[in-house]
Amino acid sequence: AFVIPAGQADMTRVAFVADVLIAQGIELGRTRGEVKIGDLAFPAGSLVVRLDQPYGRLAKILLEKQDFPDPNLRTYDDSGWTMGLLTHTEVKPVADKAILAVPTDPVDRFTAKGRVDGKGEGAGWIAAAANGSANLVSLRFELRSMDVHAASKAFAAGDTRLPAGSLLIEVRGAA
């Protein structure tokens, strides 16, 4: 199987990979709790892609890292098949068959969920972390009528570290 761990920095990339797999007919399961298999640990909500399914071979092709056995005989391929590398999404192969016994719920559509940290009391700014997501461009477009700034260097807001390029949106009239 392959596991796509929950809690990655940009879950919209995970959503993209999951949606591509689902569109191909590949079955995904979301873990109900934390998973520990040998030295590997995955948080609750991780996605399990079993290879013992009708489209298991396709899942393997899309998720497995391509290895060329002889660097002098590299074949030309105008397609990229390693979804994790293409999308900067962590995808872990798991050879231990114990992964097949992990309780999961079927996933028909994956939706990335954001979060808001802080209580909002006295908050005058909302920050959107610059984690490389193409969705920041869409966010910036949707907020075109608002004052949106980009952080010129990394900074911390409470316990949260935000990289340079993070969007800062002023919230006027915040309580």
What are these model-predicted stretches?
Residues 1-175:
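Intrinsic-disorder/low-complexity accessory segments
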